[in-house]
Amino acid sequence: MTEKILEKFDALEEKERILEAIRENNTDRHHRQRKKPLITPLLFDLHVQFGDTITPSASKIIKNKPHDLKNPKRSVSFKYKPNNSRSDLEESDLRPPILGTMINYEESKLMDHKEENLKSRPISLRYLKDKDETEYANPLPFPQLWSKHLCKKSAESSVPTPKLTNESNASKKENVSPPFTDQHESRTKKSMHSTDHSADSSTSRGKCPPKGITKESELTRNDEARKPHPVKQSIMLPLDCEDLLKNPKIKTIDLRPAVTVHTSMKQSHANPIIFYDTEYVQMLFLTKRFTPYAMKCTERNIVLEKNYEVLKVLFSDEPSAVSEPIQQKHLQVFSAEYAQKSINEKRKKKHDRLVSKKISPNTRYNLSQTFSSLSKKFVGYFDKDVTQGKSYKANRFERFSKTKPPPTRKLTTLPIKYDSKPLKNIFEIHKLNNMTPLDNLLGLRA
């Protein structure tokens, strides 16, 4: 940061030298005609234009004057010079145009304007040594690229001059010397000697900084390469347990057998499963394909359930084989034969139990309770047409009977074969004298 600031001040000094040479020629020609000099005071209001006070460092001025051992804390003195001789002009032309000669030349002209400028423009000047490193890190308030318009105004209006310390400000009155003395001549010679060194140093500065910049850039690149990046830390794999203890935030990948991977997949379902064994894959697909067939049939047949309820009412809550399905699908499973055998045995047991039981043939039932259900269920189930005769004059129901078989009062239940058609059973319904009009309506609707 300091080198960049010094380079910027060097560029400003070169512009000031060119403008001062032009001013000196103009002032030498027209000085006799004009009483007041054209040179403006040496106070540059940086805080007015750019919002902050920035001046050249005191360390730079001390380097430009290394041979000034008698007065190390010499303050800047301004002297008024009424008449300029040719010797002064020649000396000024021979001198290299550097800041030190400019200050000595302007000391003789601007003594009168010093007090007015100090009263009108009180400026608090700061130096690079007095600042901390945090202030150097902040960006500069003035722009890096100077436009021509700003350069002309700043150069014509003012020139920057540093103040060394508070002690120099306090000892200004004591150090002011008369206009023409031997001390002034000795000081000018010393300034000449110091300016030669400063010129050499300024030229060396102009050449050296690029090397320093390249070295700094190389060093910064090496430092950036050496610094551990957070992305690389996440990618690196620890080889020992000590690395995990030192840096517990490092990401680790467990290189373990495939069994641990399957246990972890149960916890995170979003991760894909990768298989390495072909036999395991085949078994998995087979189980997924055939497991639905191995499950029990849990679907409900509503028609069979209703028929079973009707038969329960008819046969006094005794089960019958009619409620069960006649045909069942053979499931293609691994144990299909065993399942089929068990089903056949259960059916045989149920049919044998029904045949062994004796049911009373002369049983009469109340038609008001079961007429509607019987007329709906049994007509479609036995695949026969039921003939209903009705006398409209007497409003009484006649006998329901099957057409083909002879009329009998017994209900016979024979063992049912698995692949046979429904049985042809005979039901006889007797007439009742205790009928109501509501029963007639039910009979008509049925």
Swiss-Prot record:
Ranges of biased composition (kind: Basic and acidic residues): 182-199, 213-227
Matches recorded under InterPro entries: DUF4545
Residues annotated as transmembrane: none
Region feature (Disordered): 63-95, 155-232
Disulphide bonds in the chain: none
Compositionally biased spans, kind Polar residues: 156-169
Record-linked PANTHER family: HYPOTHETICAL GENE SUPPORTED BY BC079057 (PTHR36873:SF1)
Protein name per the record: Uncharacterized protein C1orf141 homolog
Organism field: Mus musculus (Mouse)
